Amino acid sequence: MRLVGAIVIAVVIASCAQSPGPTPGPATNVPCGPSEVLTRHEHAHLTILIRGEIKTVPAFVGITATQICWLHTHDTSGIIHIEAGDDRTFTLADFFAVWRQALSQAAIDGDRVGTGESIQVTVNQQPYAGAPETIVLKEHQDIVLQLGPRFLTLQPYVWPAGY
């Protein structure tokens, strides 16, 4: 009887636990290891709007219980942490690969462009004419991806103290 009780308790605890965040993706350009590497420590910000609605960038993209990728998130603020061991170039495509989500001129994170729709991109409040996946991630960059119409004009991201 004690074994049955222990199993029931374990099942209840497991079902109430938070679900794990996304696991690191197969991005060949983004190393992952057992701890953070801070040779290069920068941050970019990503906002995603799908038909005028904000789509949250999840916490713990690129982080598992055993490893952390050089591109990752700690929370749902949209801040992408670039914590790397060298000065290699990382793109938004690299971050989306770690996240295991689609990014192109026809799709953002599983949402595809429909008839009469398009993807608009701004970097630091300036229109970006290239493919969104080619955006090079840089310190304090403010990246906005919008699939619409319903395109919104956003204020620049205000960085929290310490970033």
Task: Kindly give the residue locations of the regions a language model identified.
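C-terminal motif of bacterial Sec signal peptides marking the signal peptidase cleavage site
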Residues: 12-15
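Sec-dependent signal peptide recognition
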Residues: 1-9
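Ubiquitin-like/PB1-type beta-grasp interaction modules and other compact soluble beta-rich domains
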Residues: 17-163
